[in-house]
């Protein structure tokens, strides 16, 4: 189960179910959070997409990493292999339309900020949308998936398709 339930693969890594965020819903979410100064990362099976200039995206990646490495300076962050991997793999786009044109399924939207009050306001605002599931791994982030893409129900559906019950798996 990948992307918080947005994709299910069998043991041979074949996709057996996809439940990504449709482009129309992605656009709707982007419009909803436009008023908030928060970074958005579009997670896809072809890598992470970020909107902005190369420099803006670089700063966004540094800011995100400093959320997890609070004692590291900017200079220390940019020397890590984690940072190099992120910079090498990120797809920088100037606007949402580029993501839309690529036609790549978006599994999750990830937003983060050092401003915890901003994160709470964004979360509260997005939770009103019944088409999405809003969660977070840390108080500094917001993770959004399609409402149908939640690990528990997806796991139940998948194991039942294999002939098992939740009691047998859990």
Which residue ranges define each predicted feature?
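Conserved acidic, metal-coordinating active-site core of Asp-based
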Residues: 32, 36-38, 43-170
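Alpha-helical substrate-recognition element adjacent to the catalytic core
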Residues: 1-26, 37
